Amino acid sequence: MSAVASILSIILFLAFLTSGIQKVLFNPLASQSAGHLGFSKSAFQRIGMVEIAGAVAVMAGLAAKGTSFWAILNELAAGGLTVTMILAVYFHVRKGDDVKVFAPAAGLAVLALLELIFRLA
């Protein structure tokens, strides 16, 4: 795995762990976002749990190589986080949100995809 993939894994871990914790704890910003996007509290908290699990899985496979369980887990997590953020962008666009509202999700989707690409290269 390249140094770029390692750095991206660490960035993804920190970003998704932070985001997921905020959703699980349902802080005021998460509450506002959930309501705006049409998600219930429990659904938004489950999204947060998925983000935390993805963050941990990306980090768990950080040093793994080849076709080991941990390497595959990292790749699946990066792919899953990419899809999660693409769906986040979709829900924001569907609500007519401005680009600045969904830019962080779009950026994380790109970073997760890049991590996967560099991981597989």
Regions found by a protein language model. Give the residues of each.
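Membrane-interface extramembranous regions
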Residues: 1-121
